[in-house]
Structures are given as structure tokens and as C-alpha cells.
Amino acid sequence: MLSIQQNDLITQTGAGTPAGGLLRRYWQPAALVDELSGNRPIKPVRLLGEDLVIFRDERGRYGLIGRRCPHRGTDLAYGRLENGGLRCAFHGWLFDINGKCLETPAEPDDSNLCANIRQKSYPVVEKNGILFAHLGPGEPPALPHFDCFIAPNSHTFAFKGMIDCNWLQSLEVGIDPVHTSFLHRFFQDEDPSQAYGKLFRDTSRDSDMPMSRIMREFTRPRIEVEPTPFGFRLVTLRQISDRSTHVRVTNLMFPNAFIIPMSREMTITQWHVPIDDEKHYWYAIFTSFGAPVYKDEMRRQRLALYQLPDYIPNKNKNNDYGFDPHEQEHETYTGMGADINVHDQWACESMGAIQDRTTERLGTSDKAISAYRKLLREAIEKSGKGETPIMVLDPKQAASITGPAAIDGIGPAEDWQGYWQKSESSKRQAASWTNGN
């Protein structure tokens, strides 16, 4: 358990807070490219407690600036895109992607007011369907060469969803390899040929055993937490027989992302990004090591589950997450349908807006959560001292952080380490875009 002060330290992310200062040192997802794809590419964004507006100008450049016009505080999200920037609808003040004031049209011709005005702005980069922003001071760090960033656009798909609670409790679910045996338990296995775009519905690599069966029948895994330059690797072992072991390799990508295998050919890189301290978005890039991603199918599957424009889940606390007692008895462990995002959403939101960690009791199976909190506290302390925390990278360091491995397969019990490494290598050798690396 944590003290109130310890919990506040790692959950509060507004401007001026220790964790907020840390998270601002990294690139954070701010919006999907899809959200700015229409005729009016302007969207209000709340990120780390800051109210902002993201837009694409006529030249295709992205900008992220303060939402309130510095003139008299009106909402720039209702502005006009023209003349190289975003124009306030109140008095026509015009700002470019860097927050520079280009025009104050009601002022006298000889006025220098415009030259003295600078709207808050943050740099934006696009990576495979997600617009990332850097809200911290100084030069942004280099982005690591993760698979999700270097894969061609044809082999990736990006999506997001809102969760009505603090970011940390959702991130901790993502590095908890035991909950899948319970929270995501399906009493019947799906035909793998119908599993495209779904987590835990494919067969495990090098076997004909569905992932859902493995999670259901083997509920006491052995968990290895291995420190890495990017955070840590999680290796979860479920002994299937005297001769074979199920090996699942996942990763914590500091500060607020994880990478997991979705199927034999696809991985998910998922960030949990604070809107404020009591709600957040998950952002995900799905990366295929096989055929190009069927983006239309992936999008169709997910848009059926979310309400736009804010990506609010159709199943939520207001309708009891679709809970069905009959389904809970006969089909799923939760009775909340087949979408595992709903299961995770219920688990996280039911802890409260900000989980009270002063009353929790962690067990042996929570070792990754304990490891992450230690890493987070150390990084907060370093950042507070003006030192460079883990994963604030220069270009050379970023180029050295590749992959990482993310595998779900069944191999020989006596050499599970050799098995997953060979399996990962085989996956990469077969991919069209990895150059075998």
C-alpha cells in the first residue's frame, strides 16, 4: 500500500506537479490523424490538464496552441483556418502553428501589438496515425525506433478510447499479466479464422491452442520482470505440460506505454495519456508483421463500439457496461460482452476516479506493478533534480532502442528463453518491412 502523499505523487499530472513535469518531457499522443481528416481540421484537446486546440493549416502543417485567445479569452476551437493559421472568430486575430500572432486586423496599421503577442504552443509530429505533442520545456527528445514508428503506414492502424479514471490504474492493468486469466476469460473459444482484429482470440504461435483457452485453464503463471533500457520486459510463463510452456513476452515502455502481442502476426503499442487527473485516453497503434492491415475492417469494428467525436465507449458506467447475468454464467467471466476494452474499462473505473492505493494489498503476481512504481518514482526524483530520466533520448540513443519483442507462443519447457527469441527472430525475418531485424 502507499501513503496518500505517495499516491498523489504518481497520479497527479497537472502543470507544476512532479509527475506532470516528468510526463511533459516525453512525446505524448494528442489526437488521431483521423480526427483532423475532414474539411475543417480543427479539434479542441485537453491534455495533462491543459486546454489546447490542434489544427492543420493549409500547408498541411500541424499546430497545437492554447485554446483561449490571448485577446479576450474566447475559444479558438471555433476559429477559421485561413491565411496560414487559425483565426479567432471574435476579432480576427490570427495565429500560426508556432503560436506567432500574424494579424490583429482591428488595430491601426502602425500598431505593434501583434509583434508583442505569442500564444502558447507546442511542437507536433505525426507517427502512423497519431499526432504526438511535446508539452515540456527545451528541445523535445528523439523518438525511439519502435516497430510501431518505423513500420510502413500500410502495416499499422491507430485508434483511441476514453476511460473515466486516472491514467495510472489503466497503465497498471496493461502490465498485469494475470488478470487476463480472469477478467478476459471466455468460456468458449472462437474460430481463429474469425479472430482478425481481436485480442486473445487467435491461436498461440507454434500451436493450435487458442489464447483464450490458455488464459482460461492456466491461471497461476510464473512472471519474470527484466529491466531494459526502455523500461522492462515481462515474460509470463504458463506450464502446459512437462514438455511445453506457454511464453508471453510483453513490455513496459517508459513512461506510459506498453507493447503486447495481439495475435501471431500483430502487436499493440498502447499509451495511457491523462486528459486530466480523473480521465484519460488510451491510444493504440496496431502493427502487422504479416499482411498489410485491413484498416477499414479495424476501423469498422471499433467505431461500432464508440461514440464520436470524443471516442466515448458505448458500454460505460451509465449503462452498467452492458452487464448481463446470463452471459456471466454461460459465456464470459464479466458478463460484459466480448470487447476486452470494456472489461478493462470496468476494472479501472470501478476503482474510482483516482484509486485509493492506501488500502490495496499487492501480491506476488503484482511484481510488475511494484517494479513500475519504483521506476516511476525514481524518474520523478531525477526529473525534479534537473537530471535526465530514462527514455529522454538523443538521436543516437533513440536509434539503439528498437523492437521490442512481443510474442505469444508455446515452446519447449526446458528452453523457453531460446524459444521466444527464435520465435521473435522468425517473425521479423518473415516481415516485409523489417529487413530481417
Label each residue range with its predicted role:
Residues 2-4, 18-21, 100-109, 299-314:
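Short, charge-rich amphipathic segments
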Residues 24, 118, 125-127, 266, ...:
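A short, structural micro-pattern
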Residues 21-22, 27, 62, 101, ...:
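Tryptophan-centered short beta-strand motifs
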Residues 1-27, 31:
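A boundary/linker detector
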Residues 1, 15, 31-157, 222, ...:
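Rieske [2Fe-2S] iron-sulfur-binding domain
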Residues 15, 61, 138-437:
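C-terminal catalytic domain of Rieske-type non-heme iron oxygenases
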